[in-house]
C-alpha cells in the first residue's frame, strides 16, 4: 500500500517540478531515499519472515512464508518502476509504460510456463520477481532520455544481490541460529551500504522538525 500511495504522490510532484538536468538534485536524492527505505524494509522482512509467519498465518497457510522473499523483492522493484514512471508521466510519453509493461507481461507468461510445472507456486513467485526486475531495468534505461539521475548503480546492484542471497539462505537452511545469523549479517551489510543515505534522511527529518 505504501508504494502505491507514494508513487501516486510522486507522479504529481514529478510533473510539477520536472527538471531534465536535475540541477537541484531533488529527483536523485528522492530516489536514493526511497530505494534505501524499500531495500532495508525488504531485507528486514526476509530476516523476520519465518518468525512472523507463526503469528500472521494460519496453520494451513504457514508454508506461504516460502514465497514471501521473492514476492517482497518483486514489490521493491515494482515500487522503483513506479518511481521511474513519474518521469514518463511528466514528459507525456505513454509508450514507455506500454513497452515496459509488455516486456514484463510476456516474460512473466513465458517464465510461468517454464518454471511452474517444475517448481509449482515457487516458480510463479520467481517468475513474478524477474518480471518486475525487467520492467524496472527497461524504465531505468529509458528514463536516461529524459532526466540525468546521479545514482550509485553498483552499490544498489550489490544490495539487490544480498537480498537474493538472503532469500536463498532462508529457503535452503533449516530455521536455526546459523540461518538467522547469516541473514542478520547480510542485513547489516545492506545497512552499511546505505549508511550515508540513512544519515541524510535522518538529517532532513531532524531539520524539518527543527523548523516547526
Question: Which residue ranges define each predicted feature?
Answer:
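Short runs within selected transmembrane alpha-helices of multi-pass transporters and secretion channels
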Residues: 4-7, 47, 66-92, 96-143, ...
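Selective transmembrane-helix segments that form parts of the transport pathway or gating/packing helices
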Residues: 31-39
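Hydrophobic alpha-helical transmembrane segments in multi-pass integral membrane proteins
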Residues: 43-46, 109-113, 163-178
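Membrane-proximal transmembrane or re-entrant/amphipathic helices at the cytosolic face
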Residues: 149, 170-212
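Membrane-interface helix-boundary motifs at transmembrane edges
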Residues: 20-25, 91, 144-154, 173
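Hydrophobic membrane-spanning alpha-helices of multi-pass integral membrane proteins
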Residues: 102-106, 156-169
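Interfacial segments at transmembrane-helix termini and the short loops linking adjacent helices
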Residues: 28, 45-76
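Helix-loop junctions and terminal segments of transmembrane helices
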Residues: 1-32, 85-90
Amino acid at each position: 500500500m505504501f508504494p502505491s500511495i507514494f508513487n501516486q504522490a510522486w507522479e504529481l510532484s514529478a510533473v510539477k517540478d520536472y527538471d531534465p538536468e536535475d540541477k537541484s538534485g531533488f529527483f536523485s536524492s528522492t530516489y536514493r531515499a526511497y530505494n534505501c527505505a524499500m531495500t532495508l524494509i525488504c531485507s528486514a522482512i526476509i530476516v523476520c519472515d519465518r518468525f512472523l509467519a507463526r503469528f500472521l498465518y494460519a496453520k494451513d497457510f504457514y508454508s506461504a512464508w516460502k514465497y514471501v522473499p521473492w514476492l517482497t523483492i518483486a514489490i521493491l522493484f515494482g515500487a522503483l518502476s513506479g518511481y521511474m514512471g513519474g518521469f514518463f508521466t511528466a514528459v507525456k510519453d505513454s509508450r514507455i509504460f506500454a513497452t515496459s509493461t509488455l516486456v514484463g507481461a510476456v516474460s512473466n507468461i513465458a517464465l510461468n510456463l517454464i518454471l511452474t510445472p517444475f517448481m509449482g507456486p515457487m516458480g510463479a513467485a520467481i517468475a513474478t520477481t524477474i518480471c518486475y526486475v525487467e520492467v524496472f531495468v527497461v524504465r531505468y534505461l529509458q528514463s536516461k532520455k529524459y532526466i540525468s539521475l546521479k545514482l550509485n548503480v553498483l552499490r544498489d546492484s550489490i544490495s539487490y544481490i544480498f537480498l537474493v542471497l538472503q532469500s536463498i539462505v532462508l529457503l535452503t537452511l533449516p530455521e536455526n541460529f546459523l540461518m538467522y545469523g547469516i541473514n542478520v549479517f547480510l542485513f547489516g551489510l545492506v545497512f552499511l551500504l546505505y549508511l550515508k543515505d540513512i544519515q541524510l534522511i535522518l538529517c532532513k527529518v531532524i531539520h524539518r522538525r527543527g523548523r516547526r
